[in-house]
Amino acid sequence: MAQVDYLHLCDLSFMDQVGKHCIIGMFDIIHAPAFPATHPTMSLAMRILGQPGEALQVTFELGRPNGNVLATVAMDVVAGADGGANLNLNLSQTQFPEPGRYTLKILSGKEVLASRSLRLVKMDLPQQGPPPQPPAPQDKNKLH
């Protein structure tokens, strides 16, 4: 049975020229000024462990705060000689209908291998008030 070694939500993930998994800007919260909110780009970086050369079928699932599934992506993976497979799932223009705690899951069949929470929070925008006033002129004849 496959296992998840790690699962990170981040701004960007990729494999470099020598096979190092580069994971940039991990996060677990998104602040949005209004809902529905669209997040321009994010990436799931993960390492799946199985047997060397094993064909693995895993599914990514994004769940809404009410439990309904918002998105699903199925992936076929072949484990390397060490039994591991590094994966990057890039998500673009993901729409979040409401604030709350979303769930990111990696499944094999119906079994949840790993899950993470992603909180969507309504951002408080600063109130627009009158512009600041310059300081009052000082009396030049007055001693300090």
Segments from the language model and where they lie:
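Contiguous segments within soluble domain cores/interaction surfaces
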Residues: 2-144
